[in-house]
Amino acid sequence: LMPAPCTICNMIVLQCCTPITCIEKTKPCCVVPCDDCCCGCGFGCLAVGSAFPACCMGYFYHMFQTRIQAYVSNMTSGSERPKKIIIAMIYYPDQEQTGSWADGTLGLLGYNSNPKKLQLLIRKVFEEAVSNIKIKGSEVIPLPLFQVLDGKTTSDYCQRVEPSPQGGRKMANFILDLI
């Protein structure tokens, strides 16, 4: 769990200095088409200015669209691309503080005091970045796992951030329904 320095800086600005209403209204202005080369701090940092009004969202749009698109494209670059590619967005963590090893990290992300803000960030990145990934020769199916594990049912989780057997079943059924 060691994020890149740019990820930390952009998340701090979003959590501490950016109102929810600003995040709700943020749209990407443009896509920075280059993948990063420097510990996640190359072109991703330039992407900060590619979203408005919450400019730091540009960094996360770049990470979850440009970088994932490049990764998946490279991973499937053989002679035959798959017909369909499912790209999943993370589920929301459990909202209950349960004494988990993840409580401290979730607290630093503001999740213990205001889970709606991090949930909004996850949803916006899914809508504006993950849902816009294109892979030549394949149908990309965006999968919002946060629609299944929404953070409200503690029994769906182990340690707040991992699915329990019950949560895993819910995700598996969601994926099966999708395909």
Locations of the language-model features?
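The substrate-binding groove and active-site-proximal loops of carbohydrate-active enzymes
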Residues: 51-63, 116-117, 159-162
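Loop/turn elements at helix/coil->beta-strand transitions in domains of secreted/extracellular proteins
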Residues: 80-85, 136-140
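Short, well-ordered beta-to-alpha junction loops that form the rim of enzyme active sites
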Residues: 88-92, 144-147
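Substrate-gating cap/lid alpha-helix
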Residues: 95-144, 165-172
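A short helix->loop->beta-strand "cap" motif at the edges of active sites that frequently abuts
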Residues: 55, 59-62, 66, 76-84
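Catalytic phosphate/metal-binding cores of nucleic-acid and nucleotide-processing enzymes, i.e., regions
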Residues: 74, 145-148, 174
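Oxyanion-hole/transition-state-stabilizing segment in secreted/luminal serine hydrolases
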Residues: 1-59, 91-101
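Histidine-centered active-site loop/cap adjacent to the catalytic His
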Residues: 155-179
